[in-house]
């Protein structure tokens, strides 16, 4: 939306609303939203069993490339052999059996690519970013949102990362990861990232009553599934068992994609509106991001913007980078006991929370204000 004053902007998406089911629940067609033309296309049905079969069948090439990365030699091999075609057909089937695969959307880009000045696919983990990047690589500004995980080492990505016009990363850690995978033959690249919006809070009295929220709480915002939570619920319950006098509850905001743990100290809100989310963040005592896989972490930056002290998973390079660059506006924990220790320090020290909150606000304003981000993005668009 921030580009509409300078460009005609279209957003191409699918009709999928729930990524787990992968069903076309939103009508196909065009819609104007805040000056942006949103075009929605039907996605193919997902085939979970078939997808898992192809993932297993192509595992060896990902594992081989990951081992070369761990030995710190993949980048040097990539300088000589930038494009890998091993297991290409099987990895194509991995993509085509996955969620959000839409031949109709891809065909639209192929047909209309000459009408676009720039194409900006986001998230290389999903089929659309991969296929749209190859439709018009000379016009493509790829925003890969990469993580250190198995899928990052797919051989088919080598063609994309060496042929697109520009690659915009969210953090230095993400950029370094890509450089060590794709080497010096990788396309021109740099940081773009994303800015943080200021959203008005919903009325706190109404929100608190609606979701039965306590006075003091640790807050998680995101998908409620095992892959994102990484034992954090169990860690918190161990904390409460050790510190019986603690008044903290654990509020989890987001859709339920795995069975919730039932406990009197745990409160699940389900999906909330943006205004409600900001009200819940503003009144949290402490926030936590337990994910091991992040390319940026918007929720961490939103919390910092509102002066919230953060606890993050130390096993995620991107989150560790935020801790360092913000001068410890966020604290990394490494295991259950470390989490318990640092949460206790934050719960019992208002001064520490205030100091971290001040640092977080400065960090977001310095690195993630929209003026900084839009200058980078427009420069990338004009370069293609």
List where the protein language model places each region:
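N-terminal subdomain of nucleotide-sugar transferases
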Residues: 1-42, 114, 236-244
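Donor nucleotide-sugar binding/catalytic pocket of nucleotide-sugar-dependent glycosyltransferases
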Residues: 139-150, 157-203, 213, 220, ...
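Aromatic "clamp/platform" in nucleotide-sugar-dependent glycosyltransferases that forms part
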Residues: 292
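Short hydrophobic beta-strand element within catalytic cores of glycosyltransferases
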Residues: 309-313, 318
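A short, well-ordered alpha-helix in the C-terminal region of glycosyltransferases
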Residues: 345, 352-366, 376-379
């Amino acid at each position: 939306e921030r580009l509409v004053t300078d460009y005609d902007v279209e957003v191409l998406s699918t009709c999928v609303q729930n990524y787990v089911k992968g069903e076309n629940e939103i009508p196909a067609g065009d819609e104007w939203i805040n000056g942006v033309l949103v075009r929605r296309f039907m996605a193919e049905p997902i085939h979970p069993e078939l997808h898992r079969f192809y993932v297993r069948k192509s595992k060896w090439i990902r594992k081989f490339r990951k081992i070369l990365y761990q030995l710190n030699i993949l980048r040097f091999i990539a300088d000589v052999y930038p494009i890998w075609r091993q297991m290409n057909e099987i990895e194509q089937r991995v993509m085509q059996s996955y969620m959000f695969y839409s031949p109709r959307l891809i065909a639209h880009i192929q047909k209309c690519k000459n009408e676009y000045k720039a194409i900006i696919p986001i998230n290389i983990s999903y089929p659309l970013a991969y296929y749209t990047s190859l439709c018009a690589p000379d016009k493509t500004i790829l925003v890969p949102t990469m993580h250190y995980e198995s899928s990052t080492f797919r051989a088919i990505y080598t063609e994309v990362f060496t042929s697109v016009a520009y690659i915009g990363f969210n953090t230095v850690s993400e950029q370094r990861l890509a450089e060590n995978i794709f080497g010096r033959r990788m396309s021109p690249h740099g940081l773009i990232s994303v800015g943080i919006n200021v959203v008005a809070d919903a009325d706190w009295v109404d929100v608190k009553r609606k979701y039965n929220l306590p006075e003091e709480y640790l807050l998680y915002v995101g998908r409620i599934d095992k892959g994102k939570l990484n034992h954090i619920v169990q860690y918190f319950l161990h904390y409460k068992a050790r510190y019986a006098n603690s008044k903290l509850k654990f509020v989890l905001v987001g859709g339920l994609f795995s069975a919730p743990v039932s406990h009197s100290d745990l409160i699940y809100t389900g999906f909330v509106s943006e205004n409600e989310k900001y009200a819940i963040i503003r009144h949290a005592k402490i926030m936590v991001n337990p994910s091991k896989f992040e390319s940026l972490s918007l929720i961490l930056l939103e919390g910092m913007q509102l002066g919230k002290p953060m606890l993050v998973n130390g096993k995620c390079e991107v989150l560790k980078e935020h801790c360092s660059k913000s001068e410890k506006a966020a604290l990394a924990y490494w295991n259950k006991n470390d989490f318990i220790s640092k949460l206790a320090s934050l719960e019992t020290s208002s001064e520490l929370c205030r100091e971290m909150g001040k640092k977080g606000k400065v960090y977001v304003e310095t690195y993630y204000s929209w003026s900084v981000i839009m200058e980078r993005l427009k420069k990338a668009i004009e370069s293609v």
